[in-house]
Amino acid sequence: MNRITKSKEMPVYLFHQGTNAHAWELLGAHRQLNGKTSFCTWAPHAAAVSVVGDFNGWDAGAHPMTRLNDQGLWGVTVEETHDYDCYKYRIITGDGRTLYKADPFAYHTQTPPENASKVYRLGGYRWHDADWMTKRTGKDARSLPVNIYELHIGSWRRNEDGSYYSYRQLAGALPGYLTEMGYTHVELLPPTEYPFDGSWGYQVTGYYAPSSRYGTPH
């Protein structure tokens, strides 16, 4: 993203008004089918911003970002990227400090304690819940029983070697347990990315990134 196009003018306006409920479509890293990735971040007090990562050898001068407006949006398009490329924003502050920051709008990240963001294209996922969606049609949810099971993915169950269950393993093991115990719904403790393994995930560092402890977004 090297400039604000006509189609982006309203999303940008709403973002600065604090009313853009789809800001993730504007900011972050958006990888296209041709391998290009558009990066956009908000750093209103920065003197300069660049994106550094696996795709440019972490070279601070390879991909400087353009300040897109007076409110502090910065953007750049990188020509050749791959899924899982790690990256950060290199920010020069107004007082001359150099900071390396992860992308708060990233879809995927390194597994903590590493904290770089990762390029990841979300498209192409195939859902397999058509039968369940069909059965749900016509039912009045307000008249059905509700029994909610609150679950922290990392501590509910682990493999024999102590490693975390993956999202796939959880999907295989959890429904039968819930049915046996009489639960109708699941409330996940924060499944988004967070830094400290000893917590339940409330120190969120990536609201758009499912925790990489348990697998990829797909």
Language-model features: where?
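Short beta-strand elements bearing conserved aromatic residues within extracellular beta-rich modules
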Residues: 49-51, 87
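Short amphipathic alpha-helices and their capping/turn segments at secondary-structure boundaries
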Residues: 135-138, 171-182
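Short proline/glycine-enriched turn/loop motifs at strand-loop junctions of beta-rich domains
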Residues: 42-49
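Short, surface-exposed loop motifs enriched in S/T, G, D/E and P with embedded aromatic residues
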Residues: 61-68
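The feature marks proteins involved in alpha-glucan
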Residues: 1-38, 68-150, 155-162, 169
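Aromatic-lined carbohydrate-binding/catalytic grooves of carbohydrate-active enzymes
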Residues: 161, 165, 176-218
